[in-house]
Amino acid sequence: MVGKTSKKSASVAKKTVSKRSTAKPKLLTGGNPQIAKADGDAPVQAYIAAMPGWKRDVGRRLDALIVSTVPSVRKAVKWNSPFYGIEDQGWFLGIHCLTKYIKVAFFRGTSLSPVPPVESKQKEVRYFHIHEDDVIDEAQFAEWVNQASQLPGERI
């Protein structure tokens, strides 16, 4: 039997692999998708695809606005949230799903003009919350993204 796999073991292994590849991401508290930490566009797109309900379309639109504003943007998923940054400058923005809204964090938000509306406990961070029925001012959002991308980013 050396070097051989029993039929039962091979069958169990196949089932385990197929379950992993077809499993949908788990939604954490507030409906935030659980996506493994990774760099690049693919994990960010997996996060967006796993965003529940109305948040998915908003996530796609935010991602498109960020990419069109900063074509050289660097992407990653860290701590179950997409991060956007500039190579060798750090991260300037993060997105997180909560029960009733999407939270966009501008890590140097107090340096933006106008300052995004929601305060943070962290000195420089400001948030922009998007609720289901909100109309996003895309020009303002793109301007924040443009300004944020030119500031020193967070080293995370």
Predicted regions, residues:
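Charge-dense, helix-prone N-terminal extensions
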Residues: 2-156
